[in-house]
């Protein structure tokens, strides 16, 4: 994966040029997944990370960093069961992403990479052979120490930071709960070919205030998948992605192979 924001010119308060940044990141990863039973599977991913803020200013120099990280995940999906007027099955999953050492953009200073935990679950209401309604709920938390006024968290190792992140918020347990974001969504699927989707994402106003609704649709025919989504901001804080419309197009080569 490669991501770049392009060249960005920086200026001081007087409008005088101070430098140019070209932030970009590159990730190369390899993954392995194993089905441990008919209903449960796990996976692990190891990745090389290169992050380059590419900024040389008048007072400091930020150097590119090279590091590695590990992702660990698990997924459980029950067998389809009858619930009277409909069939159904539920899903549970977890993902711990970006487990890895701290990085240094400035000599003598180290920063935590964004290790995070995701917990999710969902249920499929299988109404008949053509109609299915799926619901999903997900919680996410950064597994890094809370920044403190005295900067004492900087002396914490990345491994200790993962565990201490559950109890180091200055505001106690109530603030720890605010560090969780949550999202839920629903999808209506007809004949495994046409889908309508909606969802909501919420982050505490004290931790960033990202809050938005989403709407979307999808269409699948043979090996071709077309999806679109629209994001609507629900917060007083502006979101750079608000009122954005996204399109995606994908091909399933396995479907093409099966046809032949």
Where are these predicted regions, by residue range?
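Subset of outer-membrane beta-barrel
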Residues: 1-260
């Amino acid at each position: 994966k490669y991501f770049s924001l392009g060249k960005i010119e920086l200026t001081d308060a007087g409008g005088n040029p101070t430098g140019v940044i070209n932030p970009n990141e590159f990730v190369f990863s390899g993954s392995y997944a194993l089905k441990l039973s008919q209903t449960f599977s796990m996976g692990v991913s190891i990745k090389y990370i290169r992050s380059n803020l590419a900024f040389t200013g008048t007072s400091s120099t930020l150097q590119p960093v090279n590091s590695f990280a590990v992702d660990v995940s698990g997924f459980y999906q029950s067998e389809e069961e009858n619930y009277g007027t409909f069939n159904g099955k539920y899903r549970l999953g977890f993902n711990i992403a970006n487990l890895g050492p701290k990085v240094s953009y400035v000599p003598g200073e180290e920063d935590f990479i964004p290790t995070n935990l995701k917990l999710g679950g969902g249920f499929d209401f299988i109404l008949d052979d053509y109609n299915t309604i799926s619901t999903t709920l997900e919680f996410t938390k950064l597994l890094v120490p809370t920044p403190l006024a005295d900067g004492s968290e900087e002396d914490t190792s990345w491994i200790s930071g993962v565990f201490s992140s559950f109890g180091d918020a200055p505001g106690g347990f109530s603030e720890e709960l605010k560090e969780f974001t949550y999202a839920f969504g629903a999808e209506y699927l007809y004949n495994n070919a046409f889908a309508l989707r909606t969802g909501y994402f919420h982050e505490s106003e004290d931790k960033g205030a990202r809050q938005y609704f989403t709407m979307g649709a999808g269409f699948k025919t043979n090996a071709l998948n077309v999806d679109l989504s629209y994001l609507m901001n629900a917060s007083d804080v502006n979101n750079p992605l608000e009122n954005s419309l996204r399109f995606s197009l994908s091909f399933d080569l396995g479907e093409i192979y099966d046809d032949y």
